[in-house]
Amino acid sequence: MKHLTKIAFLALLLASTSCASRKKTVAPVQPQPFEWLTANMDIQAEGNGMNFDDLSGQLRMRKDSLVWLSVTATLGVEVLRAKVSTDSVWIVNRIEKTYLAEPMKNISETLGIPLSLALLQTLLLDNNEGLPPVENQTVQLKSFVWGNLSAKIKYHNIKLDEKTAFPLKITDKMERYHLKKKGY
């Protein structure tokens, strides 16, 4: 009798769980509000005949105000540092030992694309709504092809902060570097 009770219990348990079909409801993903965003990234990029497979980076962003990016290669060697504000772009290329400090308008005209801080933040945050049309443009989750530039970005250690700002010491160094090179 003991075995019959156990078998009946197991059969009842199996019958109650095996035939149930459940539809999982997935809520639509909404953009998270933030004031500051900090993220580490693994980057694969190619464009203009160059291919970079093993890059990592650190992204710091203030909504509608600033994008700061530091890209490092293997062994932690910094390859590129960039700061993009609403009206200017500063880029230090450590490999070629060059830098760029230009108004956003000049870079937009040179590239022939409507470049802006809002567009850059849209691409980095994987929010493809409102992107201006460009030939061969595709934007997908954590990767994009825009014109002749393509990149795959894998974010990890993302931190959204609504109040606290990150220290701008590294960006200040970049500006001091720019002023030193200009001879000011």
Protein language model features and the residues they cover:
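Bacterial N-terminal signal peptides that target proteins for export
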Residues: M1-A8
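C-terminal motif of bacterial Sec signal peptides marking the signal peptidase cleavage site
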Residues: A15-S18
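Bacterial signal peptide processing site
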Residues: A20-K23
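A short, Trp-centered hydrophobic/proline-enriched beta-strand micro-motif
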Residues: P31-N48
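Short beta-strand segments that buttress and anchor functional surface loops
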Residues: M41-A45, L69-T72, L141-W146
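Hydrophobic/aromatic beta-strand elements that line small-molecule binding cavities or substrate pockets
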Residues: L55-R60, I153-Y155
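An acidic-aromatic
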Residues: V67-L117
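Non-transmembrane domains of secretory- and envelope-associated proteins
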Residues: L131-Y184
